[in-house]
């Protein structure tokens, strides 16, 4: 996957040569040095391969060791619970953001550091983004995919400017990444939009990328449309 990512990066550099405004702006961008909180999107399913749970446990532990607070959807099972529990066991902090109706259904993790309840799903997602210095996405179902694509769209529009890392465990996100590359190839997206996200193959790589991805810039919204 690293070789594939390098090819995409080379393709990106080649294709945007004519976008002088974009290149001028990107050289001025700074990288995050002090990351205090990371939003983690992931599955609530308990019936998935253990490799996903191992990655979730390791990610929670790594973030806690770096004193990075985790912001998540407060799930009491699946990868959400795995990330939260491993972070707490390592001395970390976890803030849950969850709508009232999910609390009423008993879907919330009750042992987290901080609880924030919202009225709607949209309010929940907006608050999670506002509170975070970056996003890491582990594999998940429709909810996770919706959250990931929405935050990528917000970054494309200059609303969310911070790092987005896709943690591609077991090649789970490879079909999605190929679809996004196809969207670029067929002019549904611009070539430079490939830099809206980065791909990691391990929790260690995902955390490392947080500190190496340039912050996006609101000026890039001029490139949002084809």
Indicate residue ranges for each PLM-predicted region:
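Arginine/glycine-rich "motif VI" loop of SF2 helicases in the C-terminal RecA-like domain
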Residues: 88, 154-162, 188-190
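A cross-family phosphate/adenosyl-ligand binding-site feature
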Residues: 25-131, 169-204, 209, 215-226
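Active-site/ligand-binding-proximal alpha/beta "capping" segment
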Residues: 123-158, 165, 216-222
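Serine residues within intrinsically disordered or low-complexity segments
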Residues: 9-10, 18
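Short hydrophobic alpha-helical segments enriched in small aliphatic residues
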Residues: 4-7
């Amino acid at each position: 996957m690293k070789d594939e990512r390098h090819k995409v990066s080379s393709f990106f550099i080649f294709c945007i040569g004519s976008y002088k405004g974009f290149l001028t702006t990107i050289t001025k961008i700074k990288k995050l040095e002090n990351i205090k909180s990371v939003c983690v999107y992931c599955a609530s399913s308990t019936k998935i391969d253990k490799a996903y749970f191992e990655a979730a446990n390791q990610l929670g532990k790594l973030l806690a060791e770096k004193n990075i607070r985790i912001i998540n959807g407060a799930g009491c099972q699946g990868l959400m619970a795995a990330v939260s529990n491993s972070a707490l066991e390592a001395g970390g902090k976890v803030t849950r953001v969850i709508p009232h109706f999910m609390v009423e259904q008993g879907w919330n993790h009750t042992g987290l550091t901080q609880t924030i309840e919202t009225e709607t799903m949209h309010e929940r997602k907006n608050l999670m983004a506002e509170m975070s210095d970056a996003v890491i996405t582990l594999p998940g179902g429709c909810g996770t995919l919706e959250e990931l694509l929405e935050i990528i769209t917000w970054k494309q529009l200059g609303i969310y400017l911070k790092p987005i890392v896709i943690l591609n465990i077991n090649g789970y996100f490879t079909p999605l990444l190929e679809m996004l590359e196809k969207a670029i190839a067929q002019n549904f997206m611009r070539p430079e939009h490939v830099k809206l996200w980065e791909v990691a193959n391990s929790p260690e790589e995902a955390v490392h990328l947080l500190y190496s991805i340039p912050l996006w810039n609101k000026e890039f919204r001029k490139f949002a449309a084809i």
